[in-house]
Amino acid sequence: MEAKEVVQRGYDLFGAGDMETFFGEIIHDNITWTFPGDEGKHPLAGVHKGKENFIANMSKIPEYWDNFMVTPQAMISEGNKVFALVKGTADGMDTMFGHYFEVENNQMKVMMTFDDTLTAFNAMKK
């Protein structure tokens, strides 16, 4: 699979709620997920290393946002690197995000999120 296809498959699985396949097949054991921001101010902020840490932090999403969904609008791919322009929605949220990936052996090994943190924060369940 091309890197762009791996990333699209990840979004498809995430959107379908097939987290077992998403985490089991798409996420590399040594993934590094960087979510810029001050840890403690935003529940997802920080550098999360390893699949277990990735799963633990991704699992926070339903705790803070009802009906959270990410839908890619466009992707640019160069070699193993992919950048996705993503529509992010949840109850009280309708915005755009940018997600950067590096793919290795048909799995996401690096993910960096450039999200509209103010809109997401304002939509969080308090």
Model-derived segments and spans:
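C-terminal and inter-domain tail/linker signature
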Residues: 1-126
